[in-house]
Amino acid sequence: MGKILIKDCTIVPISGPVIGKGVIAINDDRLHYVGPAGGLPAGWQADTVIDAGDMVALPGLVNAHTHAAMTLLRSYADDLPLKQWLEEKIWPREDRLEREDIYWGSKIALLEMIRSGTTTFADMYFHMDAVAGAVVEAGLRASLCQGLIGLQDTSNKRLEAGISMVKEWHGAGEGRITTMLGPHAPNTCTPEYLTRVAETAAGLGVGLHIHLAETRGEVEDVKARYGATPVALVNKLGLLDLPVLAAHCVHLTTEEIAILAEKKVGVAHCPESNLKLASGVAPVKEMLAAGVNVAIGTDGASSNNNLDMVAETRTAALLAKGITGDPTVVPAHQALVMATLNGARALGLEKEIGTLEAGKKADLILVDMRQPHLMPPNDVEANLVYAARGSDVDTVIVNGKILMARGEVKTLDAEEIYAQVTKRMHKG
């Protein structure tokens, strides 16, 4: 890793005001200095110098909810309601996927994420050891969990796989991999199964990653079965007493929003997937006002259909304004906070990533602002949210290692990945 100096860049630290003509000094895997050039400790020498005169540096983006390997199913089943999409298309196809398929499906996802500025992601799927192996090779940071569909896990084999995932991979990849347990949703797991998973997670010292209140159908189904809404049910069962990352949270009452805030639940808002599946629009304005930690996720590429967090952040900001009729909701800085620090907090990583501050992990991206759609730079944060594209990301650094420079990914062989993914596209 060594020492890296990024000079002459505009810095969006998230934790403070924008810094013009700043420098960032990286010592191995940590940020050593972030600020004006004059403040760099005298005598500090770098092994690698990056001239970033036309660049903006900001924390790496955090994709708070996705299913990386589902990139294999991009454009496979579109324009369908969620229930039909899952039960008639996705789940039958997934039954035919093997470990190697998951590995290569994950690698194409990681390539896409690196190229569009994501440095950390939260993932729920199966054959998660294959996902973890791909993450180690790519150099990204990830929170991984085995997806646990309780109604299909009568022998507890999936739960056992989830436990093995935690024990074998938590802290792997120089600490870049963390783990959770992943009960799929309240309508695909019985209360008894949810309780068992929560108790297991508590014993392992990890949190939970769960889909929650994604569709109106889910809410009605859970109410009909158990006499409570999804949020009320998981709260009653004690799940929310653990660290919880809850994906979607589209259909919520005022009382449920208060519960999420009180229990410090991290919400992964997935606007583009929710729009495409016509699941609804999450009450982001109300959640933020109540103090809920709202992060941003893409969901899987099979329902988005991309993993571009730059685009997702723009959608999150614009959708919140359009649905409320209030143009002041989710201003540019708030959107960037949601895509970085709030994502880190939702994954329990806010002490290490999410802002550019000395002492934190060196996870950052450089965005090339010398683009016609980013000129003039009247407001750097506004340009990043409302005008930037994922393809504007020039450099990606994770844990002090340069994963992409001048748009070239150094840790993955794109042509090999394309060939493998194309070969597996029609499997089964």
From Swiss-Prot:
Transmembrane intervals: none
EC number: 3.5.4.28, 3.5.4.31
Residues where substrate binds: 94, 158, 184, 214, 299
Cofactor note: Binds 1 zinc ion per subunit.
InterPro entries: Amidohydro-rel, Deaminase_MtaD/DadD, Metal-dep_hydrolase_composite, Metal_Hydrolase, MTA/SAH_deaminase
Top enzyme class: hydrolase
First and last residue of the signal peptide: none
Family designation: Belongs to the metallo-dependent hydrolases superfamily. MTA/SAH deaminase family.
Functional summary from the UniProt entry: Catalyzes the deamination of 5-methylthioadenosine and S-adenosyl-L-homocysteine into 5-methylthioinosine and S-inosyl-L-homocysteine, respectively. Is also able to deaminate adenosine.
Protein name in the entry: 5-methylthioadenosine/S-adenosylhomocysteine deaminase
